[in-house]
């Protein structure tokens, strides 16, 4: 089994973790924005039928 030679520093670990978290934040923001546009009817990327 491959074993790393040296321990990853806390700073590197924190940077990588924050980058990973930031990706999730942007995905959630995009999803929320899309949901808002669908709710208000301003969406240009989705065609949704409204039941009257």
UniProtKB/Swiss-Prot annotation:
The biological processes this protein is annotated with in GO are: translation
Q: What InterPro entries does its record include? A: Ribosomal_bL32, Ribosomal_bL32_plant/cyanobact, Ribosomal_zn-bd
Annotated localization = Plastid, Chloroplast
Q: Which UniProt keywords apply?
A: Chloroplast, Plastid, Ribonucleoprotein, Ribosomal protein
Please give one Gene Ontology molecular function term for this protein: structural constituent of ribosome
Which is a Gene Ontology cellular component entry for this protein? large ribosomal subunit
Domain of life per record: Eukaryota
Q: Which family does it belong to?
A: Belongs to the bacterial ribosomal protein bL32 family.
Q: What is this protein called?
A: Large ribosomal subunit protein bL32c
- Which organism is the protein's source? Citrus sinensis
Q: Which gene encodes it?
A: rpl32
